């Protein structure tokens, strides 16, 4: 018996929706990264995109534990001398709900063409509405609510 290697044309990408209300950022991000890669499937093949589409709603209501809402800092640089900007988690959530979750998931995916294709299958929305109802996404429950 030989090992099965998935072929891109044979892979079925399902759609899932996750409600991030009162869930912990890292726990949601790690589960989403696992499902975007397709490692939860028996046909997982490292060089083929076997993952599913993930829609995350209520990303504005995701939590972090402890004092990370003030201590966790996201940096970006404009390219000019002295052009570094630092924003903490609370301010980033207020200005761009869901971007912290996108950055966390992106950091857990492989870097390169396959990883870039995987991150495109992640759809994050700050509110409870999403435009993907035509795909009939299944509800995916994730453990790890903030205490």
UniProtKB/Swiss-Prot annotation:
<dbReference type="Pfam" id="PF00572">
    <property type="entry name" value="Ribosomal_L13"/>
</dbReference>
<dbReference type="GO" id="GO:0003729">
    <property type="term" value="F:mRNA binding"/>
</dbReference>
<comment type="similarity">
    <text>Belongs to the universal ribosomal protein uL13 family.</text>
</comment>
<dbReference type="GO" id="GO:0006412">
    <property type="term" value="P:translation"/>
</dbReference>
<feature type="region of interest" description="Disordered">
    <location>
        <begin position="127"/>
        <end position="147"/>
    </location>
</feature>
<dbReference type="InterPro" id="IPR005823">
    <property type="entry name" value="Ribosomal_uL13_bac-type"/>
</dbReference>
<dbReference type="GO" id="GO:0022625">
    <property type="term" value="C:cytosolic large ribosomal subunit"/>
</dbReference>
<comment type="function">
    <text>This protein is one of the early assembly proteins of the 50S ribosomal subunit, although it is not seen to bind rRNA by itself. It is important during the early stages of 50S assembly.</text>
</comment>
<keyword id="KW-0689">Ribosomal protein</keyword>
<dbReference type="InterPro" id="IPR005822">
    <property type="entry name" value="Ribosomal_uL13"/>
</dbReference>
<protein>
    <recommendedName>
        <fullName>Large ribosomal subunit protein uL13</fullName>
    </recommendedName>
</protein>
<dbReference type="GO" id="GO:0017148">
    <property type="term" value="P:negative regulation of translation"/>
</dbReference>
<dbReference type="GO" id="GO:0003735">
    <property type="term" value="F:structural constituent of ribosome"/>
</dbReference>
<comment type="subunit">
    <text>Part of the 50S ribosomal subunit.</text>
</comment>
<keyword id="KW-0687">Ribonucleoprotein</keyword>
<dbReference type="InterPro" id="IPR036899">
    <property type="entry name" value="Ribosomal_uL13_sf"/>
</dbReference>
């Amino acid at each position: 018996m030989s090992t099965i290697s998935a072929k891109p044309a044979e892979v079925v990408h399902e759609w899932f929706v996750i409600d991030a209300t009162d869930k912990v950022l890292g726990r949601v991000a790690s589960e989403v990264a696992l499902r975007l890669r397709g490692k939860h499937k028996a046909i997982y093949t490292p060089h083929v995109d076997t993952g599913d589409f993930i829609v995350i709603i209520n990303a504005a209501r995701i939590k972090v534990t402890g004092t990370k809402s003030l201590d966790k800092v996201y940096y970006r640089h404009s390219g000019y001398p002295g052009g570094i900007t630092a924003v903490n988690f609370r301010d980033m959530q207020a200005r761009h709900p869901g971007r912290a979750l996108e950055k966390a998931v992106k950091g857990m995916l492989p870097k390169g063409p396959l990883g870039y294709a995987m991150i495109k299958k992640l759809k994050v929305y700050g509110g409870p509405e999403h435009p993907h109802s035509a795909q009939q996404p299944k509800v995916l429950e994730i453990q790890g609510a903030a205490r």
